[in-house]
Curated annotation (Swiss-Prot):
Coiled coil stretches, renumbered: none
GO cellular-component term (any): cytosolic large ribosomal subunit
Pfam families: Ribosomal_L32p
Superkingdom field: Bacteria
Similarity comment: Belongs to the bacterial ribosomal protein bL32 family.
Protein name listed in UniProt: Large ribosomal subunit protein bL32
PANTHER family: 50S RIBOSOMAL PROTEIN L32 (PTHR35534), LARGE RIBOSOMAL SUBUNIT PROTEIN BL32 (PTHR35534:SF1)
Organism: Yersinia pestis
Keyword Cell membrane listed: no
């Protein structure tokens, strides 16, 4: 089993954790229906970029 030889410094620990932050989902408002949806996804009633794509 691998065992470290030296204790990692606070700096190295911080560098490793620098990419661990969570980000919030970016939301958009549809032009036609005014509905909030995830970016690059259709709305619940089937609109994408102002056009009806489903239903």
């Amino acid at each position: 089993m691998a065992v470290q030889q030296n204790k990692p410094t606070r700096s190295k620990r911080g560098m490793r954790r620098s990419h661990d932050a969570l980000t919030t989902a970016t939301l958009s408002v549809d032009k036609t229906s005014g509905e909030t949806h995830l970016r690059h996804h259709i709305t619940a009633d089937g609109f994408y970029r102002g056009r009806k794509v489903i239903g």
